């Protein structure tokens, strides 16, 4: 008989792997091809997320990419929670986020992870997710920069978790926020120079 602790570790490892593979699905590239927009990696910033799809001028493709990228994070969390509990849900959300940023199907060269981050938060603790989405929306509306909105939402998510009385999510939010900042290094440089493209600007 396999010891219980080994079984639990095996299940957690399998959950993380499946969540990572789900996160690795490049919905942006798939939507771009489905709508005849070409290879998304050769468009605009070359990023595989919804913002870059929007640069093609196809709002429906961008919307579907946003929903699907957020959805894969949410689905990973919901399934892991239903099967194994809250710790597994956080692990699955983190793994799905890593899958989007470093997808095995694209040679580990993926997106910035913002939509998957928001979808994961909405599924993991919806008050934090709603707060992050609201912060993103307000910042985007004021400054018209998706990257800046993502950075502000990510930076404030640990504070939102703490303020809302969800201490178990503080470290999770901080870890994902750190990765989002690392993935946005180029954007941060362009923002500082006043060269960051505005939302909706076509390629």
Curated annotation (Swiss-Prot):
Lineage, opening ranks: Bacteria, Pseudomonadati, Pseudomonadota, Alphaproteobacteria, Rhodobacterales
A single BP term in Gene Ontology: phospholipid biosynthetic process
Residues spanning the membrane: 10-30, 60-80, 88-108, 118-138, 162-182
Family statement drawn from the similarity comment of this UniProt entry: Belongs to the PlsY family.
GO MF terms held by the record: acyl-phosphate glycerol-3-phosphate acyltransferase activity
Lipid bilayer topology: Multi-pass membrane protein
Protein name: Glycerol-3-phosphate acyltransferase
Subcellular localization, as worded in the UniProt entry: Cell inner membrane
Reactions listed under catalytic activity: an acyl phosphate + sn-glycerol 3-phosphate = a 1-acyl-sn-glycero-3-phosphate + phosphate
NCBIfam families: glycerol-3-phosphate 1-O-acyltransferase PlsY (TIGR00023)
GO cellular component: plasma membrane
Subunit structure: Probably interacts with PlsX.
Coiled coil (UniProt feature): none
EC number, as in UniProt: 2.3.1.275
Function per UniProt: Catalyzes the transfer of an acyl group from acyl-phosphate (acyl-PO(4)) to glycerol-3-phosphate (G3P) to form lysophosphatidic acid (LPA). This enzyme utilizes acyl-phosphate as fatty acyl donor, but not acyl-CoA or acyl-ACP.
InterPro entries xrefs: G3P_acylTferase_PlsY
